Amino acid sequence: IETLGHRGDEPERLDRPIDPWDLQSIIYTSGTTGPSKGVLSSYLHLFTMATSSREMLDHTDRRLINLPLFHAGGTGNAYCMLVKGGSIALVDSFRTETFWDIVRDSGSTCVTLLGAMTPFLMKAPPSPQDRDHPLRNAFMVPLPADAAAFRERFGVQ
């Protein structure tokens, strides 16, 4: 069986070492204010995203990623867990009705909630299972005014 991308010879040599500001990839904005836009992301930008939550997470964490991997939210979260040595649970989208079941089934301990995700979860009817999950950390962007109510209801930092 041939390994994907393996040609049996040495990898091509670089003309120069990679610098932190060199282009690593193109990621896309969410399109909140219009069509999605491509953003040139350097190695330093992605490294900074990957290490921004280093104090809160470790190798035992599993991050639920419900954001596309072409978006900074998906890419940065995946890189974060690579840096930490943790794992990811990758799902195709956010759905209020299945969010907590996915958290429980996947064993996810952290998640990033963007925009309307937090209000949608708060508007769901209270349940005896609101605190029956492994989630410890929720990174909310933007931080909603009722973040304390979210923490109290769901037992999440």
Region spans (language model):
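Conserved AMP-binding/adenylation subdomain of ANL enzymes
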Residues: 47-62, 70-110, 120, 124, ...
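Conserved structural elements of the adenylate-forming
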Residues: 7, 11, 20, 24, ...
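Short beta-strand->loop structural element characteristic of the AMP-binding/adenylate-forming
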Residues: 2, 37-40, 65-66, 87-93
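Adenylate-forming
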Residues: 1, 67, 92-99, 108-150, ...
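Short aromatic/basic micro-patch
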Residues: 17, 40, 112
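ANL superfamily adenylate-forming
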Residues: 1-20, 125
